Amino acid sequence: MVQSFSSHAIAPAAVLRGEGAWSEALPRIQALCSKPLLLGRSSSTSQLRHKLTADLSAAGLIPASADLEFDCCERDLTRLHLESQLCDAVIAAGGGKVLDAGKLLAHRLSLPCITVPLSAATCAGWTALSNIYSPEGAFEGDVSLNRCPDLLVFDHSLVRQAPPRTLASGVADALAKWYEASVSSADSSDGLVQQAVQMARVLRDQLLIDSPAAMDDTNSAAWVRTAEACALTAGVMGGLGGARCRTVAAHAVHNGLTQLPACHDALHGEKVGFGILVQLRLEERMGGNRLAAQAHRQLLPLLRQLGLPCLLYTSPSPRDPIG
């Protein structure tokens, strides 16, 4: 029985998903704002964001645009806070760090937040949580927000244009939901946490089956299931389970790796995936968990098949690779 009061931000107020979701979202965006700030970062998504800006203008809105210089970083957020004073909503279009920055900026300005993931690399478009990094890319902490985004637009035609590496990274990040929750929350008596753990198990099973086919064919049903599992379903578990279902060893390893300049080019999920392998080794060697050894043997071939890093080398020669 849950003895204490708890508050949950479980899901965005509205979710539009599928082919053409962005076009369908425009009337909803009109209802939320008239002068949105469109936030992005990567030069690789600049053309997509120019199109989104043109669509907003064609819909009668007056959009402003801004780019992050760093990851979700206080230096950027301070600058954007000043630049967005005339805006009445924040639209974050990009990867996880752009989405985190947009959510946190909207939270601090008390403005509506619209997330438009341009990859399936994380579930940041869904959650009421933002990770903060230093200008150098080192993880500094996370901030819990009072609500999930007001609107999440998951347009398959936009997400499909992302590099395959981002989907592989999203698979690793989503898989961590099970491997971490099964350690942190397996003995919880909280019904919501129990249900989040079981959802994480089902999600893991689906990704083990679907993700290789999804990587091979972006027009397949497996791609849709995998991309939505990574960007949407994984976020549901965070909303239901809260802190009890995240940040065990896999994400702790990620957070540590961000302190190393040599790891800054690795995507979030690539570091998390390596962290899962570390966690399973710790469970096996320090906890005597034979199931962890079996899970390691099951997971390692998949991560390799998806092209995810499975070894940590120290220059100039490798030492005790985890994989």
Predicted regions and their residues:
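ATP/NTP phosphate-donor binding region
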Residues: 1-89
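Solvent-exposed alpha-helices and their adjacent loops that cap or buttress functional pockets
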Residues: 7-9, 29-31, 82-84, 106, ...
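A glycine/threonine-rich phosphate-anchoring loop and its flanking beta-alpha core
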Residues: 13, 107-199
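A short, small-residue-rich loop immediately preceding and capping a beta-strand
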Residues: 84-105, 109-118
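Active-site segments that bind and position negatively charged phosphate/pyrophosphate groups
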Residues: 189-301
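N-terminal loops that bind phosphate or other acidic moieties
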Residues: 308
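Single conserved hydrophobic/aromatic residue that forms the stacking wall/gate
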Residues: 313-323
